[in-house]
Amino acid sequence: MHKKVLVCLPLNDAHRAALEASVPEFEFRFNVLDDVHAEDVLWADVVLGNAPVSMISQNKHIEWFQSNSAGPDAYLKPGVLPENCMMTNATGAYGLAISEWMLAMWLGIQKDMFLYRDRQNQRQWAPIDRPVRGITGARVLCVGMGDIGSNFPRRAHM
């Protein structure tokens, strides 16, 4: 079975080669998201990555659309994807990475790391005039308990 696959993800050469080797009967085109062309979207049976909605909606034969975001609401509107198109998304792909980044930012804020960095860049070595804060016993409000919102409290041991 021959399929035409448009990949709109920033893949390196090794990942491209691995993808092509996994299904040698498929034909691939690789575009970085900032450089997606309408003719490539119209050519494709499968689109991997968030091609512009305006282009996706013009492809009436697309069979599978893989969104690289967890919230693909724009693609779910009537008329964007054909009725028989399978759509998948990246729910669950970012919870660990983003929640660890959030934890790093929270620690940085609590410990005034950004103020210290700014003072260091200005060659000011005076201490910051306020008590040091920590995260032990701190309270955090998580709004939204999707993959990221439920991962963050676990990382913070709350």
Give a label for each model feature:
Residues 83-139:
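Phosphate-binding beta-alpha-beta segment of Rossmann-like dinucleotide-binding domains, i.e.
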